[in-house]
């Protein structure tokens, strides 16, 4: 079984158009999350880093601890930034990856407004800034939850299932759906390329002590020698972050 870092280092050997990143500035917001952090690690493992990578995070100290190994890298900068606010910078970002969003169930209950604004407001702020600063493409990390409730069969990309609009839990999938529509609207109206990905249940290293998603709870149970308690017979579409 390969380790996380072995997987990350292997990405550089994939046949991907890395040359398109030459002489560009790349911004990843939500850089300390599971997906954002893996993307930072992938880009910083590339042998020829002729681009500048900016890691945006709300907690500057936590980000500095996460990326301590890159602190002396000339091509790497940490930015203190909360995506719910307009961008306070004055530099060009040619590629932006929006991976900033609460994903833990406790946030859906305790801060549903924050969940919504991080997604919808975040997309709006990033595109609004990018229009004035030579943005070429924005990648929005959405979620498989946009498909709503299923019937046990695999989803198709064009599927759109129902969910309870009036539950606090709906803050997450409804925000993701609206943010996706906002992405394609900006792309059409301002001719800025956009892509959307819909990962389902991501798991991997570096989850925080506050993460109360099922996989994180299961891992804590195992480490503590406790029984794993399943609260439903449901199935999860799990994918490791390095995949």
Question: Where do the protein language model's features map onto the residues?
Answer:
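Non-catalytic terminal and boundary segments that flank Rossmann-like NAD(P)-dependent oxidoreductase
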Residues: 1-27, 41
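N-terminal Rossmann NAD(P)H-binding glycine-rich loop of SDR-like oxidoreductase domains
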Residues: 27-45
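NAD(P)H-binding glycine-rich loop region in Rossmannoid oxidoreductase-like domains
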Residues: 80-118
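Conserved Rossmann-fold NAD(P)-dependent oxidoreductase catalytic core, especially the SDR/UDP-sugar
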Residues: 98, 124-169
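Glycine-rich NAD(P)-binding loop of the Rossmann-fold in SDR/ketoreductase-type enzymes
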Residues: 114-125, 166, 170, 174
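Flexible, glycine-rich beta-alpha linker
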Residues: 146-148, 170-171, 195-213
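Active-site Tyr-X1-5-Lys
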Residues: 167-195, 223-224
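Conserved small/polar residues in nucleotide/adenosyl-binding loops
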Residues: 239-243
């Amino acid at each position: 079984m390969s380790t996380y870092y072995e997987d990350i280092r292997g990405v550089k050997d994939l046949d991907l158009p890395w040359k398109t990143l030459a002489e560009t500035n790349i911004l990843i917001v939500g850089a300390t999350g599971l997906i954002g952090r893996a993307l930072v690690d992938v880009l910083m493992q590339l042998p020829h880093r002729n681009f500048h990578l900016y890691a945006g995070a709300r907690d500057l100290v936590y980000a500095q601890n996460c990326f301590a190994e890159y602190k002396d890298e000339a091509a790497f900068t940490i930015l203190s930034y909360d995506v719910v606010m307009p961008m306070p910078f004055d530099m060009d970002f040619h590629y932006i990856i929006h991976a900033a969003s609460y994903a833990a169930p406790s946030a859906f209950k305790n801060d549903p407004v924050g969940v919504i604004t991080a997604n919808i407001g975040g997309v709006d702020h990033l595109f609004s800034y990018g229009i004035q600063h030579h943005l070429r493409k924005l990648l929005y990390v959405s979620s498989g939850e946009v498909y709503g409730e299923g019937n046990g069969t695999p989803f198709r990309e064009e599927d759109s299932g129902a969910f309870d609009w009036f539950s606090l839990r709906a803050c997450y999938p409804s925000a993701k759906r609206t943010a996706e529509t906002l992405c394609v609207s900006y792309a059409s109206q301002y001719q800025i390329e956009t892509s959307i990905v819909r990962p389902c249940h991501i798991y991997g290293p570096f989850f925080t002590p506050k993460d109360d998603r099922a996989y994180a709870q299961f891992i804590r149970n195992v480490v503590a020698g406790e029984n794993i308690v399943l609260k439903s017979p449901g199935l999860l579409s799990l994918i490791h972050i390095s995949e």
